[in-house]
């Protein structure tokens, strides 16, 4: 909704920073998608349960049996595969392609500190930032295990202080 209001007001950010689902929304906006396009894509996808189930099975490593087995209660989903399967085609594939500079906040699980991406593997950064522990597998990156950026910094506006005069935070 916030992105749609910004669109209506003709406000285009000069920089974006996000954590967890906010990193995915931020990358969608930085890729040039409007708030309406993002909402329409999500509603269309959510409204088609058969397609969602098909995509979940497609994204799942292993068989359909392992997807629903009780022994799999702690086996987590692969966030990279989920994103590859569900992200709209309009979303860019690298930080260099983004129309707006973007920072993605993740949490270094064992280091108990924030890891911020502004370059490198965009898909891995989004996947790590949205990897809720025990739901999604941590993302191994540079020999570190990265999880949901919202754990350490849920609204990473502090990465925008030197990039923008006005900062809008959404929680």
Provide a role label for each language-model segment.
Residues 1-19, 27-171:
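Patatin-like phospholipase
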